């Protein structure tokens, strides 16, 4: 199962998210749930880098697939929109395939 934890501040802005584990929906190379989650998360990070000037840190472990993304500067409206779009897509995956494969956890920091 993949677990994604979204950390929001008191203004409900996402400051950080972590992604760990593999969905386990199917065999390696054919797991459409894991691939969908990966595309959403990686595309969001790439889009923030390409289309905004917001500073962030991102640690990724290529072997495990774990990602730890954190804004280190004020969050722009564009970056916030990209993150919220990712969350929307992740919620749809969770609704379609269930919590057996994807757990979304929201925490206030």
Where are the regions that the model predicts?
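N-terminal intrinsically disordered, cationic/polar leader segments
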Residues: 1-32, 41-42, 46-109
């Amino acid at each position: 199962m993949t677990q994604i934890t979204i950390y929001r501040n008191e203004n409900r802005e996402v400051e950080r998210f972590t992604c760990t584990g593999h969905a386990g929906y199917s065999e390696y190379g054919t797991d459409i749930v894991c691939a969908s989650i990966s595309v959403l998360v990686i595309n969001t990070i790439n889009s923030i880098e390409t289309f905004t000037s917001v500073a962030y840190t991102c640690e990724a472990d290529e072997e495990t697939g774990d990602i730890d993304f954190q804004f280190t500067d004020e969050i722009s409206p564009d970056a916030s929109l990209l993150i919220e779009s990712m969350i929307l897509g992740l919620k749809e995956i969770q609704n379609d395939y269930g919590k057996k494969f994807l757990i979304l956890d929201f925490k206030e920091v």
